[in-house]
From Swiss-Prot:
PANTHER family: MOLYBDENUM COFACTOR BIOSYNTHESIS PROTEIN 1, MOLYBDOPTERIN COFACTOR SYNTHESIS PROTEIN A
Lineage: Bacteria, Pseudomonadati, Pseudomonadota, Gammaproteobacteria, Lysobacterales
Subunit details: Monomer and homodimer.
Top-rank EC class of the record's enzyme: lyase
Any GO BP annotation: Mo-molybdopterin cofactor biosynthetic process
Cofactor note as given: Binds 2 [4Fe-4S] clusters. Binds 1 [4Fe-4S] cluster coordinated with 3 cysteines and an exchangeable S-adenosyl-L-methionine and 1 [4Fe-4S] cluster coordinated with 3 cysteines and the GTP-derived substrate.
The name this protein goes by in its record: GTP 3',8-cyclase
Ligand binding (S-adenosyl-L-methionine): Y30, G74, S125, M197
Species: Xanthomonas axonopodis pv. citri (strain 306)
Amino acid sequence: MTAPMQDRYGRPLRDLRLSVIEACNFRCGYCMPADRVPDDYGFDSQQRLSFDQLETLVRAFVSVGVTKVRLTGGEPLLRRDLPSLIARLTAIEGIEDLALTTNGTLLARQAVALRQAGLRRITVSMDALEPALFRRMSGDRGEIAQVLTGIAAAEQAGFQRLKINCVVQRGVNEDQVLPLVEHFRGTGHVLRFIEFMDVGSCNGWTPDAVVTSAQLHERIHARWPLVALDANYTGEVAQRHAFADGAGEVGFVSSVSVPFCGDCQRARVSADGHLYTCLFASQGHDLKPALANGEPALATHLRQRWSVRGDRYSEVRASVPRRGKPVEMFLIGG
C-alpha cells in the first residue's frame, strides 16, 4: 500500500461509506420522508454499480489508504445476494474493518449469512422503543418487534457488540432517550445518540428541532452517572462515555453542536458510483469513467480528487450560505 493521501487540510482518507442500494423499506422523516419520496423510488438496477465494479472500487480505495469500509443504503439488506459481495470484500488485503448499517427489519433472515461471509460489525438504526411511535417514525412501514428480533438473531450469529444509532428530534422522540438507554444498558451493545442534521433538502430541518448532545448527556447522567472515555481512534465521530456502574457505554454524535470536520477521514460513494467527500455535499463526482479504466487508474483519480478536498460544512454552517441542492441522506448512507 502506498502512503495515504491527504486533502487540503491534511486529513487522510481512512474510511469509505459505500452505498450498495438507494432504495429503502422505511420512510423516516429525517432521511426519506414519505410525502417527498414515492414508494417506488429507486434507480434502474442497471445504474447501480455491479459487484465486480464495487470490488474494483474498494480495492482502489484501499490502495490509497482506506482501512475501514461500511456498507450502507438506502437499506443495504435489500441488495440481492449481499453476502456474496461481503465475501469478496473480506478477501481484500488491507481492510481492517468491514461493517454494515441497517434498519434491522431484514436482519433476522440474513444475520447468519452475513457473519459467514465475513462481516465484522453491524450498526442498527433505532429511533424509538415504543411500538406506535416507531411505526410512525418509519413512515408506517416498520415494527420495532422486527428490529429487536433482528438484533437477537445477530447476537446468535456471533455479532456480540452492535452499535444502535438513534437520531433525536425535539418534539418527536426525545422521550425515548431514557427508555432506550435502560433497554440497552448491560447488553454489551453501544447506544449512540445522533443530533438531527440538515442533510439533504427534504427533511424539514430547523435548528430548533435539534436536541444537543450536551442536553442528552445531562439527562442521561442525572439517571445513570457517566464517565468520559478517550476516543478509540483519530476521527471517531462519537464522544464516548461509560456508565459509572460498569454497565457499558453510550455515545453522542454532535455534528451540529460540536463539529468534527477537522478529523473527518471519510469518503462516501453512492450506489450509482458518485463520490461525495462530505455528508453535506451539494455535488458528487462520477467515478464510473475512471472505474472503467481499472483499479490503478481509479486510484490515481481518487488521489487527485481527495487532494483538492476542502469540505468543512459543519464548522461554517452558521456563517457561510449553502450553495446548490445538498445530496439526500438516503443516497449516501448518513
